Amino acid sequence: MSQLTHFDSAGQAHMVDVGDKAVTHRVAVATGTIRMLPETFALVRDGNAKKGDVLGIARVAAIQGSKRTSDLIPLCHPLALTKVAVEFELNEAGHSVRCTVRAETRGQTGVEMEALTAVQVGLLTIYDMCKAVDRGMVIGDVRLMEKRGGKSGDWVAD
């Protein structure tokens, strides 16, 4: 098993030095779900939520979240993102919305945290916009689905 990279030999937290790493194309895809009451799902699906276009605003929030990742995660490097794509999949039977984010950069470190943060912010925005009618929504199943590029190579979830 690999060692944790965000701690030095004395066990102190530090930001990893990526200065000598090659600049490569990096891609990460993350996903997560929010489950809600059938009535809440209908409001989201039909675009009838009191606060407006829930998924449109959640899409913009997810993109903004990806751009702010290094402000939120202490040892995360600031990145020049080259692409952030946000997709929502409505699951009528499960009364849920799946958010999938693909983040890309050309850089010296990966974009996994940006993709994961974007998913969480997108789902939290859905929660925020619908909480007046459903405080019991559940956010879950947030995970990295794949990462491409970099020294450690490609990885795809089982």
UniProtKB/Swiss-Prot annotation:
Chain residues that bind substrate: L75, C76, H77, M113, E114
Gene3D superfamilies: Molybdopterin cofactor biosynthesis C (MoaC) domain
GO molecular function, one term: cyclic pyranopterin monophosphate synthase activity
CDD domains (UniProt xref): MoaC_PE
Reactions this protein catalyses: (8S)-3',8-cyclo-7,8-dihydroguanosine 5'-triphosphate = cyclic pyranopterin phosphate + diphosphate
Catalytic residues, chain numbering: D128
Pfam families attached to this UniProt entry: MoaC
Keywords from the UniProt entry: Lyase, Molybdenum cofactor biosynthesis
Pathway: Cofactor biosynthesis; molybdopterin biosynthesis
GO biological process, one term: Mo-molybdopterin cofactor biosynthetic process
EC number, as in UniProt: 4.6.1.17
Subunit structure and binding partners: Homohexamer; trimer of dimers.
Family: Belongs to the MoaC family.
NCBIfam families xrefs: moaC (TIGR00581), PRK09364.1 (NF006870)
HAMAP family: MoaC_B (MF_01224_B)
Physiological role: Catalyzes the conversion of (8S)-3',8-cyclo-7,8-dihydroguanosine 5'-triphosphate to cyclic pyranopterin monophosphate (cPMP).
UniProt-recorded name of the protein: Cyclic pyranopterin monophosphate synthase
Organism of derivation: Ralstonia pickettii (strain 12J)
Gene label: moaC
